[in-house]
């Protein structure tokens, strides 16, 4: 295949991934990519992943775990590759699983709960920021337990099914 045809094919493949998502979703993925691209070089590499984990409080991530994540990509992880990888993972995923996976990023031990203060901080400082009123409404509807933890698994179930487990 000529270089021009190969380039054209790659461009075509890339444009398909953008048609899988609504513009607002693409913007949200872009914000997530920007947060993970710690060194702002336009690519997510091992150091970016390690720094992202550290920012989430997970400092002892094994090199093998990071290597496995990087190997999932067909090459350097720019935004288009990042979007493609998420597109493949989200194809056919149900909304409950998708929302749960978003919370699990912040719960590396898989406890099913997050500190309410941490959730409040993340929702008011990252991506599409919640207003104080929106946060207050959420915590009024889904109050943390006596230890200050938010049971996000139950929260996601209520969001997606409209009822408590």
Curated annotation (Swiss-Prot):
Summarize what the UniProt record says about post-translational modification. N-terminus is methylated by METTL11A/NTM1. Phosphorylated by MYLK3 and MYLK2; promotes cardiac muscle contraction and function. Dephosphorylated by PPP1CB complexed to PPP1R12B. The phosphorylated form in adult is expressed as gradients across the heart from endocardium (low phosphorylation) to epicardium (high phosphorylation); regulates cardiac torsion and workload distribution.
Positions carrying Deamidated asparagine are 14
The main location is cytoplasm
Positions with a binding annotation for Ca(2+) = 37, 39, 41, 48
GO molecular function terms listed in the Swiss-Prot or TrEMBL record: calcium ion binding; structural constituent of muscle
Q: Could you tell me which residues carry Phosphoserine?
A: 15, 19
Q: Which SMART domains match?
A: EFh
Pfam families, per the entry: EF-hand_7
Tell me where in this chain the EF-hand domain is found: 24-59, 94-129, 130-165
Q: Where in the cell is it found?
A: Cytoplasm, Myofibril, Sarcomere, A band
Q: Which GO terms describe its cellular component?
A: A band; myosin complex
Q: Which residues carry this modification: Phosphothreonine?
A: 52
Q: Which GO terms describe its biological process?
A: heart contraction; heart development; positive regulation of the force of heart contraction; regulation of the force of heart contraction
Database matches in InterPro entries: EF-hand-dom_pair, EF_Hand_1_Ca_BS, EF_hand_dom, Myosin_RLC
The entry's keywords:
Calcium, Cytoplasm, Metal-binding, Methylation, Motor protein, Muscle protein, Myosin, Phosphoprotein, Repeat
Q: Which domain of life is it from?
A: Eukaryota
Q: Which sequence positions carry the modification called N,N,N-trimethylserine?
A: 2
Describe the subunit structure.
Myosin is a hexamer of 2 heavy chains and 4 light chains. Interacts with MYOC.
**More info:** This chain binds calcium.
Functionally, this protein is described as follows:
Contractile protein that plays a role in heart development and function. Following phosphorylation, plays a role in cross-bridge cycling kinetics and cardiac muscle contraction by increasing myosin lever arm stiffness and promoting myosin head diffusion; as a consequence of the increase in maximum contraction force and calcium sensitivity of contraction force.
The identity of this protein, by name, is Myosin regulatory light chain 2, ventricular/cardiac muscle isoform
Q: Which organism is it from?
A: Oryctolagus cuniculus
Which gene is this protein's source? Answer: MYL2
């Amino acid at each position: 295949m000529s270089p021009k045809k190969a380039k054209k094919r790659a461009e075509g493949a890339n444009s398909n991934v953008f048609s899988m998502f609504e513009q607002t979703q693409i913007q949200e993925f872009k914000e997530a990519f920007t947060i993970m691209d710690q060194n702002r070089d336009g690519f997510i590499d091992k150091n970016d992943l390690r720094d992202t984990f550290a920012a989430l409080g997970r400092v002892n991530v094994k090199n093998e775990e990071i290597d496995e994540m990087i190997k999932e990509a067909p090459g350097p992880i720019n935004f288009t590759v990042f979007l493609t990888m998420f597109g493949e993972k989200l194809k056919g995923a149900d909304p409950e699983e998708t929302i749960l996976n978003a919370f699990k990023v912040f719960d590396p031990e898989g406890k099913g709960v997050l500190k309410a203060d941490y959730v409040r901080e993340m929702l008011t400082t990252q991506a599409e920021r919640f207003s104080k009123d929106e946060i207050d409404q959420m915590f009024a509807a889904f109050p943390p337990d006596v230890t200050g933890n938010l049971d996000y698994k139950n929260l996601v179930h209520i969001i997606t099914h409209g009822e408590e487990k």
